[in-house]
Amino acid sequence: MNTLIGYKKCSTCKNIEKLLEEKNISYDYREIDKDLLSVDELKKIKDLAEIDIFKLFNTSGIRYRELGLKDKKKDMTEEEIYDLLSSDGMLVKRPILLTKDKVFVGPQVKKYLESL
């Protein structure tokens, strides 16, 4: 079963939901603001998506700007980054699509779905 991790008020996440439905792809929805990702889940997402840890940040989010993470994240350890991301779902890049054997984050999700 596929899992879409997103935020219900996010227009990009809504568009991905529509795309999944148009392609008749079944999925479970996980609200990132209510059901936070654990450190282990974040590590797995990073590894399976084959992305840099900094790509897990929602750099356009309000919380990201409020915390001044553009400059601060460079001085953080990997563990500090994972701890921070696991404490606030609004800091995590979305949407995230978990398939049987792959993970797609942010713009990768749309590219993947359009390729099907």
Residues covered by each model-derived region:
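Local sequence-structure signature of Cys/Sec-based thiol-disulfide redox active-site neighborhoods
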Residues: 1-19, 23, 28-32
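Alpha-helix C-terminal capping segments
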Residues: 20, 115-116
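Thiol/selenol-based redox catalytic cores and closely related redox-interacting motifs
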Residues: 34-115
